[in-house]
């Protein structure tokens, strides 16, 4: 068995669910799980400084291989001493493989071959090519603590035969990526389980990847248009297929109920651009549901955004002021709203960890969803 650069330590299992409390040890520190990871696509979490992220207690952030490959270039980042030094972040970093972005840019399925994927840059339209070896090489240059294998991420609703071929290719690509990995002593590589909504294909993917002894395992191909019920069903049969002594990462999920439901099903790590993306539109997550701060009813509301929140935004500014800043397109408004949403999700995970410790996660979920409004007819995802 490989001596991996990152290690998972199980602290406690919740008595009534598949949830687990643990920690992940990396070359740049240890973070508790379950954990939500803010997304810093281009080596920055939009509008946030590294110091602010540390005060949130996020513990780990995510950056995007595809975007950093194109700009400023992975070789330049390596010249700077790696991503940690480049962006002045001394805590763990996870990089994705770029696969999800690449597949959104592929204009023809014929451009996905056994060798790799041909596509056009979103910046200047030039033709690019990415394959498992290149994706690993870029991430080796970036120097992230946790890396992702290059996978094919098909839409959820695809014919069985197409998904089967995709799963088999992803397994072959995973092995190629593992063989190309130059820095196993200080970078942990995760395999990504695919298979859309087909249980037998998820089982095949998990079996293929767990036989390769990755440092951890990601669950991909979800949060791509399927229903919440369908996502939970896939997690119900996928997470039990993964090793208990390694981290489990659900990619691209950030809605509060999805985070809790993922934890209930044994997931340790989550990421999503949701909190910062909706914040820039003035949509905020609170203990009492979503708030669209642009609404006229907040114009004369001089109360805190969320009376149950102790973040910098809620302890210093009113709803009326936030509404004014967002309506005026002021950068400070984007910063305050982004800070709050990230604080909300990071602290939701802190509360979830306590609920696991207390063996009352199902009660916590019920109380949270009732307050948030998820139990109302036509409730929104976030």
From Swiss-Prot:
Substrate binds at residues 96-100, 151, 194, 221. Gene3D superfamilies: Queuine tRNA-ribosyltransferase-like. Its cofactor is Zn(2+). GO terms for cellular component: cytosol. One of its GO terms (molecular function) is tRNA-guanosine(34) queuine transglycosylase activity. The active site is at residues 96, 271. Pathway: tRNA modification; tRNA-queuosine biosynthesis. Zn(2+) binds at residues 309, 311, 314, 340. Residues 252-258, 276-280 are annotated as: RNA binding. GO terms for biological process: queuosine biosynthetic process; tRNA wobble guanine modification; tRNA-guanine transglycosylation. Its EC number is 2.4.2.29. The keyword Glycoprotein does not apply. Homodimer. Within each dimer, one monomer is responsible for RNA recognition and catalysis, while the other monomer binds to the replacement base PreQ1. Catalyzes the base-exchange of a guanine (G) residue with the queuine precursor 7-aminomethyl-7-deazaguanine (PreQ1) at position 34 (anticodon wobble position) in tRNAs with GU(N) anticodons (tRNA-Asp, -Asn, -His and -Tyr). Catalysis occurs through a double-displacement mechanism. The nucleophile active site attacks the C1' of nucleotide 34 to detach the guanine base from the RNA, forming a covalent enzyme-RNA intermediate. The proton acceptor active site deprotonates the incoming PreQ1, allowing a nucleophilic attack on the C1' of the ribose to form the product. This is Queuine tRNA-ribosyltransferase. It comes from Lactococcus lactis subsp. cremoris (strain SK11).
């Amino acid at each position: 068995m490989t001596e991996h650069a990152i290690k998972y330590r199980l602290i406690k299992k919740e008595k009534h669910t598949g949830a687990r409390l643990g920690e992940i040890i990396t070359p740049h520190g240890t973070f508790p799980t379950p954990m939500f990871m803010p997304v810093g696509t281009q080596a920055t979490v939009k509008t946030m400084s590294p110091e602010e992220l540390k005060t949130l207690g996020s513990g780990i952030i995510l950056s995007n291989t595809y975007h950093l490959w194109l700009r400023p270039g992975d070789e330049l980042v390596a010249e700077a001493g790696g991503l940690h030094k480049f962006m002045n972040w001394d805590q763990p970093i996870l990089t994705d493989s770029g696969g999800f972005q690449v597949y959104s840019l592929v204009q023809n399925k014929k451009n996905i071959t056994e060798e790799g994927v041909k596509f056009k840059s979103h910046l200047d339209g030039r033709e690019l090519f990415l394959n498992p070896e290149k994706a690993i090489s870029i991430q080796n240059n970036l120097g992230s603590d946790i890396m992702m294998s290059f996978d094919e991420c098909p839409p959820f609703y695809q014919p069985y035969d197409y998904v089967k071929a995709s799963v088999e290719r992803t397994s072959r690509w995973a092995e190629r990526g593992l063989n190309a990995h130059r820095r196993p002593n200080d970078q942990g590589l995760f395999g990504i389980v695919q298979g859309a909504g087909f249980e037998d294909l998820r089982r095949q993917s998990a079996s293929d990847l767990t036989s390769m002894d990755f440092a951890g395992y990601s669950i991909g191909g979800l949060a791509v248009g399927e229903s919440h019920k369908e996502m939970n069903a896939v997690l119900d049969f996928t997470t039990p297929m993964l090793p208990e002594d390694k981290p489990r990462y659900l990619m691209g999920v950030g809605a509060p109920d999805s985070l809790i439901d993922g934890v209930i099903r044994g997931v340790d790590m989550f990421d999503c651009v949701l909190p910062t993306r909706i914040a820039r539109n003035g949509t905020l997550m609170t203990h009492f549901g979503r708030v669209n701060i642009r609404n006229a009813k907040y114009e004369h509301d001089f109360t805190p955004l969320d009376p149950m929140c102790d973040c910098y935004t809620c302890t210093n500014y009113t709803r009326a002021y936030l509404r004014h800043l967002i309506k005026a397109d002021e950068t400070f408004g984007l910063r305050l709203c982004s800070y709050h949403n990230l604080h909300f999700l990071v602290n939701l995970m802190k509360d979830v960890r306590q609920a696991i410790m207390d063996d009352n996660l199902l009660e916590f979920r019920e109380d949270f969803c009732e307050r948030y409004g998820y139990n109302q007819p036509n409730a929104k995802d976030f």
